[in-house]
Amino acid sequence: MSKKLFLSLFTLVIVNFIFAENKIISVDAKANISLLNGSISEYVFDPDSHNTDDVLSRLDWDVKNVPIVSVSVDLTLFKYAYFNLGAGFGFPSTPSGNMQDYDWLNCSDFGFPEQYGTELTNYSIHDNFLNSYRNFFVKFGFNCYLPLNITVTPFVAYNYEYLGFDSFDGYTAYKVDNWQKDEELSGNVISYFQETNAFLVGIKLISPVLFNFKIDGEFFISPYATNINSLDKHYMRQIHFIDLMPRSYQLQSNLNLSYSIHKHHKVFVQGFLQYIPVSKGNDYIRETDENGNYTSTNWTIIKSVQGGTSRFLWQISLGYCFSI
């Protein structure tokens, strides 16, 4: 009985703090749905390549109108301490444009004439589908209150992201055949997965505008504090590749416009940008059998080449916020 009484009193105290005029705790609970767009590129760099920047191969994975559902909670403690926790999830098997594979096999190892120079030698295109997407975010900051009801919040953040794509069917074409369709492909050709762990610093600005509208923006930077691991599965070649790209650089930004229907209810539209310039790292290889089972014990580093990636993604969201 005493435990129940204590829990009841504790709950009443917390509720009183939340709903009091001078709040100790303020909560914004948000839910939104968005469409994710952009592209992610995968690279192979070979110092023997005659192509620009030593690019031997590039795979462009479309991110096209991929629906994402996200939830987040903003907590403000004692008016100044700021905490944010959020997560987002995608829907597997969602169509996502194409995957296009470009090769510049103009170095002596592949036997192509040197006069090809920077010209493309091989090309293929495939239907692209989302395999998986999940995103987790946590932020800690400190609110600074300025005149005109403007709030500035510097913060530190951690972001975990995992996404993957499957490419199916399509065809290949080659320069030596004057780019005629050479081979029709069927089934799963290549799958690609990226796992990203990032530590970021940023700043958030909130400002009221006309009527019941409010605008807030965030800018993040990860100064070579993003770790990217990628896995590339070539099913037809029965080969898997891993690229390890520590100390990568990235930028993110959000812009949010909200409208207060009631003091506890808001609707909002939000835009998001993410940019990761070309990042490079060690490339590892491992062979498989026709069923995808590994035929070798360990991953072997390919000392003659490097793997790499880059991305530019943007997102438009519509959402609802409940404030207490």
Regions found by a protein language model. Name each.
Residues G38-V66, F91-N135, E161-T196, S222-N254, ...:
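Extracellular/periplasm-exposed beta-strand and loop segments of Gram-negative cell-envelope proteins
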Residues E21-A29, P67, K79-L85, L148-P154, ...:
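Outer-envelope beta-barrel architecture signal
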Residues N32-S34:
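Short, structured protein-protein interaction patches enriched in aromatics and acidic/basic residues
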Residues K204-L210, K214, Y224-T226:
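Short helix-capping and hinge/turn segments at secondary-structure transitions, especially at repeat
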Residues V71-L75, F136-C144, V156-Y160, V201-S207, ...:
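Residues on the lipid-exposed face of transmembrane beta-strands in outer-membrane beta-barrel proteins
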Residues S70-N84, G88-S93, G97, D101:
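Post-signal peptide N-terminal segment of secreted/secretory-pathway proteins
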Residues F89-S93, F137, G141-F142, T151-T153:
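Acidic, polar low-complexity intrinsically disordered regions
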Residues M1-S26, S323-I324:
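Cleavable N-terminal export/targeting peptides
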